[in-house]
């Protein structure tokens, strides 16, 4: 029987957010991190120039950049981003629109503590075209997923999901915009639950102390 992985509660949790794009998920976490919210963003890591880095700087959050092109191999980049992330001593890492696959060095250090979001109800429609694939298949309901990151593409243990109906006349843009709203709220709730209650992972099953719900 596989040995359980137990990640203890860490509130108030130190968050490192990895991002490559507009920073909408990062902004949601920054906006949430007030009052008694059980997590704070302590650093943002990027792999390119992007709006997310600007949002972090505007919020006086330290930013570090680890570009793949600046390293002789993907393995070397993996070592570098692991070290840069570890320097901020995170309790949790959030991959928030980060357009790189995290490697074995990173996962050996942060597995069970690294979250990702996906704009579909996994395991359906993984990968970068989840919204378009759901529309092409003709589903009537899709949604958002928050999961732990593993070595695969959107294959890690699922922490939380929320359905989003597909409306008549939806195209990829309109559907994706509605999913993004749910995705942001679900991520904020999942981070809070993980920070407060921790998680136990056995194989593909992740169990937290309470169910993740969004209002």
UniProtKB/Swiss-Prot annotation:
It comes from Mycobacterium tuberculosis (strain ATCC 25618 / H37Rv). One of its GO terms (cellular component) is cytoplasm. Its EC number is 2.1.2.2. The gene is purN. It is an enzyme of class 2 (transferase). The keyword Cell wall biogenesis/degradation does not apply. (6R)-10-formyltetrahydrofolate binds at residues 74, 100-102, 116, 150-154. The active site is at residue 118. GO terms for biological process: 'de novo' IMP biosynthetic process; tetrahydrofolate metabolic process. Keywords: Magnesium, Metal-binding, Purine biosynthesis, Transferase. Pathway: Purine metabolism; IMP biosynthesis via de novo pathway; N(2)-formyl-N(1)-(5-phospho-D-ribosyl)glycinamide from N(1)-(5-phospho-D-ribosyl)glycinamide (10-formyl THF route): step 1/1. This is Phosphoribosylglycinamide formyltransferase. Signal peptide: none annotated. Gene3D superfamilies: Formyl transferase, N-terminal domain (3.40.50.170). Belongs to the GART family. Homodimer. GO terms for molecular function: magnesium ion binding; phosphoribosylglycinamide formyltransferase activity. Mg(2+) binds at residues 116-117. Catalyzes the transfer of a formyl group from 10-formyltetrahydrofolate to 5-phospho-ribosyl-glycinamide (GAR), producing 5-phospho-ribosyl-N-formylglycinamide (FGAR) and tetrahydrofolate. InterPro entries: Formyl_transf_N, Formyl_transf_N_sf, GART. It catalyses: N(1)-(5-phospho-beta-D-ribosyl)glycinamide + (6R)-10-formyltetrahydrofolate = N(2)-formyl-N(1)-(5-phospho-beta-D-ribosyl)glycinamide + (6S)-5,6,7,8-tetrahydrofolate + H(+).
